[in-house]
């Protein structure tokens, strides 16, 4: 057996252990060697396959993590978050699914009792009609809001302007096919041109513009990422000005959420003065609604605990301070301090202080119809917490949806059954009344002539 010295020791020992067996011939020895080689090869192959699988999983994990990081960077710094819900997407889960759900929702809305003595639907104030980022130089937008058809355009000088949509010549819609010429808007029908003051300054085939031909213009301000126009039923110049908050100089835009709400405009900001609703509607965790469905899990999953106070000023603003704590069992895991400033009927600014830095939210409420509001929240933050700011766009939207669900099916109650805790609601309604005036279009007239007054 001199040749055994050439085999690995494991094989040599195995072969030696077989010497006691009756079959000790060369054939049996060869078979044992083959089986041991096969077993070693199988083990080595299994190890190789296992290591390959682990390596493959690790590569996939790293690729996923890298892609996730790139996505977060992209949505935080390059392409802001945009979260939008149409009117029919929130608050209608009680209507069965099916191809006719849209019709059922329309029927439910039409049969809803709206209440009596509703305030005028279009109060006086500044209202956002377009997003700054969507109105490029030379572009034109068709806007229907405040019972008006509007043409919003950005001149070649970079300034945004707003005029009535219809040309005084033969009624063509300037926002549909109209062209920007310098600071002017040109009618698509006969090429009549109107300057920034609304005056017709030129038309083809004539060296002299017609006298006394003009189109209505609207006062415009750009701030908080939107284009705002001044609406006043008495035709007065703006009663107050709005400017950029100083914080925006160091903050970047992280995105916005947008909702259509079936309610009177007054009910949206009234929510702030309704302090008790915060813990009634917004205590359930954003992470899961299991605590709402199974109260025994409420403390384990966590809940939001709210404290707030609302005060009015002597002018067009009101102020609210909110503290929100997220509690799991008896432990406070996070706290947010919010300063809320209401500026007129359709503009709110929220400054948030958190453990991960400050944030700024600009809310606009714009009446698209007597009982249809467009509500937008634009979120800003410093660069270092941009990913959290992008996440906040959705978190704030999820909270706001809880209110929208209620608004989309409630009625307006002009004389509520007030209790002691509703004191701020009564005060709010008195304060908000300053935005209605003698010639404010009544709710009934707005329904009869929704886009012409």
Swiss-Prot record:
Pathway: Steroid hormone biosynthesis; dafachronic acid biosynthesis
Pfam family, one: KshA_C
Molecular-function GO terms, alphabetical: 2 iron, 2 sulfur cluster binding; cholesterol 7-desaturase (NAD(P)H) activity; metal ion binding
Every Rieske domain range: 126-229
Origin: domain of life: Eukaryota
Keywords annotated in UniProt: 2Fe-2S, Cholesterol metabolism, Iron, Iron-sulfur, Lipid metabolism, Membrane, Metal-binding, Oxidoreductase, Steroid metabolism, Sterol metabolism, Transmembrane, Transmembrane helix
Topology of this chain in the membrane: Single-pass membrane protein
Protein name according to UniProt: Cholesterol 7-desaturase nvd
Transmembrane segments: 53-73
Subcellular location: Membrane
Keyword flag Phosphoprotein: no
Cited InterPro entries: Cholesterol_7-desaturase, KshA-like_C, Rieske_2Fe-2S, Rieske_2Fe-2S_sf
Top-level class of the enzyme under EC nomenclature: oxidoreductase
PANTHER family: CHOLESTEROL 7-DESATURASE NVD, IRON-SULFUR DOMAIN CONTAINING PROTEIN
Chief location: membrane
Species the sequence originates in: Bombyx mori (Silk moth)
SUPFAM superfamilies listed in its UniProt record: Bet v1-like (SSF55961), ISP domain (SSF50022)
Residues that hold [2Fe-2S] cluster according to the record: 167, 169, 187, 190
EC code: 1.14.19.21
Keyword Cell membrane: no
Function of the molecule: Catalyzes the production of 7-dehydrocholesterol (7-DHC or cholesta-5,7-dien-3beta-ol) by inserting a double bond (desaturating) at the C7-C8 single bond of cholesterol. Essential regulator of steroid biosynthesis as this reaction is the first step in the synthesis of the steroid hormone Delta(7)-dafachronic acid.
Gene Ontology cellular component terms for the protein in this record: cytoplasm; membrane
Cofactor note: Binds 1 [2Fe-2S] cluster per subunit.
């Amino acid at each position: 057996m001199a040749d055994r010295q050439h085999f690995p020791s494991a094989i040599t020992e195995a072969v030696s252990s077989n010497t006691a067996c009756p079959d000790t011939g060369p054939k049996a020895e060869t078979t044992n060697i083959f089986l041991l080689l096969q077993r070693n090869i199988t083990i080595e192959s299994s190890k190789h396959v296992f290591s390959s699988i682990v390596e493959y999983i690790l590569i996939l994990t790293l690729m996923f993590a890298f892609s996730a990081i790139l996505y977060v960077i992209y949505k935080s710094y390059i392409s802001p978050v945009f979260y939008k819900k149409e009117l029919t997407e929130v608050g209608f889960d009680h209507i069965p699914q099916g191809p006719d759900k849209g019709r059922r929702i329309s029927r439910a809305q039409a049969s809803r009792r709206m209440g009596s003595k509703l305030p005028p639907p279009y109060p006086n104030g500044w209202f956002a009609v377009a997003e700054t980022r969507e109105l490029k130089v030379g572009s034109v937008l068709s806007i229907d809001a405040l019972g008006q058809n509007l043409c919003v355009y950005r001149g070649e000088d970079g300034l945004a302007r707003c005029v009535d949509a219809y040309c005084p010549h033969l009624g063509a819609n300037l926002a549909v096919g109209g062209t920007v010429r310098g600071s002017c808007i040109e009618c698509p029908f006969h090429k009549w041109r109107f300057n920034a003051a609304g005056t017709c300054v030129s038309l083809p085939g004539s060296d002299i513009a017609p006298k006394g031909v003009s189109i209505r213009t609207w006062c415009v301000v750009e701030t908080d990422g939107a284009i705002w126009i001044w609406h006043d039923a008495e035709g007065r110049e703006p009663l107050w000005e709005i400017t950029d908050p100083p914080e925006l100089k160091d903050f970047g835009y992280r995105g916005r959420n947008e909702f259509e709400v079936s309610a009177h405009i007054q009910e949206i900001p009234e929510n702030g003065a309704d302090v008790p609703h915060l813990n009634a509607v917004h205590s359930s965790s954003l992470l899961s609604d299991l605590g709402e469905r199974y109260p025994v899990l409420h403390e384990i999953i966590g809940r939001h605990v709210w404290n707030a106070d609302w005060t009015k000023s002597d002018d067009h603003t009101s102020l609210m301070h909110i503290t929100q704590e997220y509690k799991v069992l008896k432990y406070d895991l996070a706290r947010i301090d919010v300063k809320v400033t209401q500026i007129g009927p359709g503009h709110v600014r929220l400054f948030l202080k958190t453990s991960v830095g400050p944030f700024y939210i600009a809310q606009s409420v714009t009446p698209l119809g007597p009982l249809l509001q467009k509500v937008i929240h634009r979120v800003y933050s410093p660069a270092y917490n941009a990913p959290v700011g992008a996440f906040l766009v959705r978190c704030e939207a999820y909270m706001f949806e809880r209110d929208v669900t209620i608004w989309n099916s409630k009625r307006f109650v002009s004389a509520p059954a007030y209790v002691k805790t509703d004191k701020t609601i009564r005060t709010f309604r008195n304060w908000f009344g300053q935005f209605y005036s003698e010639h404010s279009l009544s709710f009934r007239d707005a329904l009869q002539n929704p886009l012409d007054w």
